[in-house]
Amino acid sequence: MTFNNKTIEELHNLLVSKEISATELTQATLENIKSREEALNSFVTIAEEQALVQAKAIDEAGIDADNVLSGIPLAVKDNISTDGILTTAASKMLYNYEPIFDATAVANAKTKGMIVVGKTNMDEFAMGGSGETSHYGATKNAWDHSKVPGGSSSGSAAAVASGQVRLSLGSDTGGSIRQPAAFNGIVGLKPTYGTVSRFGLIAFGSSLDQIGPFAPTVKENALLLNAIASEDAKDSTSAPVRIADFTSKIGQDIKGMKIALPKEYLGEGIDPEVKETILNAAKHFEKLGAIVEEVSLPHSKYGVAVYYIIASSEASSNLQRFDGIRYGYRAEDATNLDEIYVNSRSQGFGEEVKRRIMLGTFSLSSGYYDAYYKKAGQVRTLIIQDFEKVFADYDLILGPTAPSVAYDLNSLNHDPVAMYLADLLTIPVNLAGLPGISIPAGFSQGLPVGLQLIGPKYSEETIYQAAAAFEATTDYHKQQPVIFGGDN
């Protein structure tokens, strides 16, 4: 059997009843990965040997009947450290880097009995919105292999959407979980900043980065967040977990819930069919008893400019550690120390990474700091205040996840600014440190349209409540790409 149509709870019941073993489930998952990998290129590393060792140990210890994730396979984005498994951030610079520790999120998942089956492809160092900047080649969209899967967590999204795995981890700096979730028709959540430890995450923008879950359904997504969320002394920005169970409100009705619909999220640059889909979703929420009203987030239009100054500045600082000396790629043609630095970085980093390093270095340079980085920080505060004003009166914000559906591979490579604008609707959430989810809300041109729900800090259970209410009364999440197939 392939098991790819079974929910996590159904798989758990099979494991507890011993109808299948963790080893059998892991072997079936590995076969699912291999059979689809040529079409998708969603993995950098398939950790077959390590996964089977983990599965055997779980079978010998026995499945934990009280833990729904015991024995469940998990794919992990390649910028999240995994003990003994290559972690390259999809870059030539880290082509041979094998950590000797697990990221806290991975360690937490393993503590729950989850089995790491591989590392997923991504935009290099999480810098990209299309899944095309990877040193290991572009990932393909699960619905149409001529389209981008979104980025930067391209492989994590495509792997879940295609049925390679049921659950995966990604990271979100400016939309890198939500946008690929939207493009692939699955559920992806960026938690509140600090909810999931960043220890072991290869840093891009440290004030923006957050690890989060991908799953086919809202409840499965919440179950994975339950496993990975924790306060962590190794991450000074992590926060105490305020919610014991992120699934606690799933199944409750949303009568009287106040949902804001920002006019800026449906304005210029939004595909007409995407706009229509979101307006129909808003009407659906009203049918479920929610109150949906138009609001304004006036400073959101500056989000992309603010983000690319702040994120690139933080990246230029974070990536200084990759110098060809301590680990990773070292240029062989260097004759002195300066050449080792220059050549290793020139050859080890891809074009998009180098572009952002240069942009960030410029923004932080003497004479330009006040005009760019400092000003960006001030506008970031205005964006945060916009959200605070709305959340004083509303429970959630509703809008599209992306301005369009997935676009053609290689169509925006020549125009980085156009690609940056694809994150227009997700970036403000990261700038404000808020939680946001993307769920399937319809189709345009045969491709999934994502609906984004945003909440105030630490409101994940309310986001899941509303998302689950929408999911329970629609069928969009049940539709699968051809590559998904079904149970044998």
UniProtKB/Swiss-Prot annotation:
Q: Name one GO molecular function term.
A: ATP binding
- The signal peptide, as residue positions, is none
Classify the source by domain of life: Bacteria
Segments forming a coiled coil:
none
Keyword Mitochondrion carried by entry: no
Reaction(s) this enzyme catalyzes, per UniProt: L-glutamyl-tRNA(Gln) + L-glutamine + ATP + H2O = L-glutaminyl-tRNA(Gln) + L-glutamate + ADP + phosphate + H(+)
Q: What is this enzyme's EC? A: 6.3.5.7
Keyword list (alphabetical) reads: ATP-binding, Ligase, Nucleotide-binding, Protein biosynthesis
Where's the active site on this chain?
A: K77, S152, S176
GO biological process terms on file: translation
Database matches in Pfam families: Amidase
Provide GO CC annotations from the record. Answer: glutamyl-tRNA(Gln) amidotransferase complex
Q: Name the NCBIfam families on file.
A: gatA (TIGR00132)
PANTHER family to which the protein is assigned, alphabetical: GLUTAMYL-TRNA(GLN) AMIDOTRANSFERASE SUBUNIT A, TRANSAMIDASE
This molecule's function is given as: Allows the formation of correctly charged Gln-tRNA(Gln) through the transamidation of misacylated Glu-tRNA(Gln) in organisms which lack glutaminyl-tRNA synthetase. The reaction takes place in the presence of glutamine and ATP through an activated gamma-phospho-Glu-tRNA(Gln).
Q: Summarize the subunit comment.
A: Heterotrimer of A, B and C subunits.
**Which family is it part of?**
Belongs to the amidase family. GatA subfamily.
Question: What is the name of this protein?
Answer: Glutamyl-tRNA(Gln) amidotransferase subunit A
- Organism annotation: Streptococcus pneumoniae (strain Hungary19A-6)
Q: What is the lineage of its organism?
A: Bacteria, Bacillati, Bacillota, Bacilli, Lactobacillales
